Amino acid sequence: MANIDPYRTEEELVEDDEEVDMSFLPPFAKGTENEVLYVENARMERRLERTERALETNMDRLHIMDEHLKNVQQELKYTQTRVEAKNKEIESEKHLNAMAEREMGRLKKDIGKMEAERQELADKINGLQNQIYKNNEKLDQFKMLMNWNQEELEQWALAERQKAEDNAALEKYRHADDGKVKELTLALERVSKQVVGRKEELEAEVVETQAAQIQLDKAAEDFRKLHVERQDLIRQWEEAVEAMRHRDAAIAAASEQFAMQKDVLRERKRELDAQARFLENETLNTKEADARVAYYEREVGKQRDVLAREQARTEELNNQVELVKATLSKAATELAQRTVENKQAREDLDAKRQKLDAARKRFVVLKRKLENEFGNLDSMEAKASELEAMRRGEEARLKAILKEHELLKKEQYKRSQVLFDLRQKERELISEISGGQGQNKNLAARIHALDEQVVARAGGVRSEEETRALNARIEKLTAILEGVKRAEDDLLAARRANTSLRADRAKLDETISTLKLENDMVSRQVKGSVEAREKALVDHDVLALEVKRLRDILAAHADEVFSLENRKQQLALSMEERKQEVEVHRDGLRAELRLLREDVHRITLELKERLLRCEKLQAKFEIISAKHRGSGEDDGEERTQAYYVIKAAQEREALQREGDDLDGRIRVAEKEVAALEATLAQLMAVNTNFAASYKKVGSKEAFEERAALRDKLDKAYDKLKARRADEAAIAGDIQVSEARLSNLGQEQRSLQALVDDMTRRKAEAQRQLDEQREKLGRALGRTDKLRQKLGLANSPQGADVELAEVRDVTRAMLLELKALALANPGAMIAEACEAAGIRLPSGGSNPPSLGGSRPGSARSQTSLGSVRSARSVASQQRGGMGGSPAVRTIQLGA
């Protein structure tokens, strides 16, 4: 008896309570213990089938849950990474806010400092304007005093000669005062130089501070760019996570659909099993089919008798009827042969059934004997080997009997199919016979009409008896003819039926063998598909791991490429900045060249003006300048040719180092690209082999899986194309950088040539300037000799003349500064003059000259001032009499 499982569900209990199909159980086994065993075996098979279905369903669910768990863990990992990125982004934003607040505080301090400086400069400007106003008033008073005629000058000179003794006494005090004034002047010059040095240091510190601020601004801008790039990366990450979530949902839906399809497949398999059972039940109708076959055989025998009688009646017919008889006899012979064959097959079937019954009876006897033997427990060990041998022999016989039983079942199924086809043919034959009878009646009527026409054509008139006799004979012959035709039609129909039955039997045999092969193939395909599915799942997991590893490698390489791109952009920005610096330096050199040319031109004009002035001084010896303080033409420090050569060499070395660095990075990037290509080629080979291994598939799940893998492969190809496009773009950028580097080298060479040309011109101008200085020194020496010879070195007339010349030189210098300020508004000349307390003239009037001298231009007055300055320097070097007034040195903006 079956064991009762307490964990079975109600549905399983209901299925177990269903009636078991007893059609396969032979009649002799009913009501015995074999029937109970058969029922228990059937129920156990049902339970096994249900358990297998439940196990397969649970395995599918377990696999789906494992996949879902992996996806959830991966999504959790991505979410944690996104949270960390968001936290870093928040920290970056806080850092940026703090930097902005610090920068705002610094700007406020700078604004306050600039406001204080502006107030201080405004106070200085007011003081300088007041001082200039007072000096202008004094200058106007002096001009009024100097507006004398020649007679007054002579009287004044006479009075001065009378007061020579008084002046001699005062001269001692003047010498002492001049010494003190010189000391104070030297101290003032030292302090001025210190102030200038402090200002230069301050400007250098300001420049360094501005450079540091620019670097900080650049760093802040780069940080902002990196912040924006990180936000873009986070956004791309979120999009990728969303795409993965959609993909996981699609995979879950596909898994559900796969489970549904498997359920449908199981349902269809269940239906096929039900159809098989129905087919087995249909075999029970074979007996009825055999009875009908016997009935049809009897009918055929009756038809033979009818045919024999009809053959006796149709002896007087033509040779065609003889031929029809021979054909009919041949068909009868074949039909008899077919009947004998069918009878022999039935006898064989009965014999096999008897053998099966005998085998089953022997099986029952042996089983009872085995049970009796099991009852004798004392002799079990002694008879174990004998019983085992008997059991093996009986199992072999049972297998043979079961195999023969299966063959008999198949044969019975074939015969039932043949019987079913014969019934179909019987219905068709009946319908054809009825149709043939109708046609025969129509033909008989037509023959009758034709006979009447023949009689009418003969023209003879028959009597009623003859007519009746002829009609009776015609009717008799017509009936005989109809019988012959019917027999012929029946014979032809029997032949056709026999031929069709043979063809149908052959088709059925072929169909049965085909169905067997298909069943075997389907079972093998199911097993193969299950194994292939398991293998595909394993390969899918391996491929997923490989894809994950390759994805990590690709992400690492993408990060490296991204860092290289950032470095490339930084290099491009630095190259642009360097290019701008070179442009600024080139503009500065051009401006310096232009200034040098202007200086050469100005020096040439000054030389001419000085020559004219020397001639004029020689002609008018009464106008002799006293002492002048020279003003150097170059206020700032000059830079020699070696400075620019060294600077250009340093820049060239820096560019060469940058080029070498770029070449090294390019080589590293090329190696990485080659490694990526090799990895990609290996991945493509693996994908190709994988696709080739799954090229021929037969199931819907395999087709769907292959389509999904093809989609993944297409996406991988798209990513590969994008990476190759990025690589091509990087190569193009590198080529552009190399082209820019070569252009910078060409510009450097052109700037070096320009610097060499400017250095050569500067040397030429310096040589000419030295020559002119020598000539000027000789002229000044001659003038000093004439002045000492005439005794005007320390006289009031000489002082007046010197004062007038100082006034003219000051006016000319102011006009020259104004012209320079108007010509170069970006040089900050006017602001520097205002800062130094010098107010430029508003009008364009020329300085007044002393009696008889023609007015000169600003350029000539400047040259005159330069000559007098040189003379003053020469007089100071010689240690001449009298002190020179202090001249304030100002620094003009570049």
UniProtKB/Swiss-Prot annotation:
Extent of Low complexity compositional bias: 844-857
Compartments reported by the entry: Cell projection, Cilium, Flagellum
Post-translational modification: Phosphorylated in flagella.
InterPro entries linked to this entry: CCDC39
Principal localisation: other
Keyword annotations of the record: Cell projection, Cilium, Cilium biogenesis/degradation, Coiled coil, Flagellum, Phosphoprotein
Any Gene Ontology CC annotation: axoneme
One BP term from GO: cilium movement
Disruption phenotype: Short and immotile flagella. Inner dynein arm (IDA) and nexin-dynein regulatory complex (N-DRC) components are absent or severely reduced. Radial spokes are attached to doublet microtubules with an irregular periodicity of 32 nm instead of 96 nm.
Residue ranges of the region described as Disordered: 844-894
Keyword Coiled coil attributed: yes
Described purpose of this protein according to its UniProt entry: Required for assembly of dynein regulatory complex (DRC) and inner dynein arm complexes, which are responsible for ciliary beat regulation, by acting as a molecular ruler that determines the 96 nanometer (nm) repeat length and arrangements of components in cilia and flagella. Together with CCDC40/FAP172 forms a 96-nm-long complex in flagella.
Subunit structure of this chain's protein: Interacts with CCDC40/FAP172.
Family membership: Belongs to the CCDC39 family.
Protein name: Coiled-coil domain-containing protein 39
Species for this entry: Chlamydomonas reinhardtii
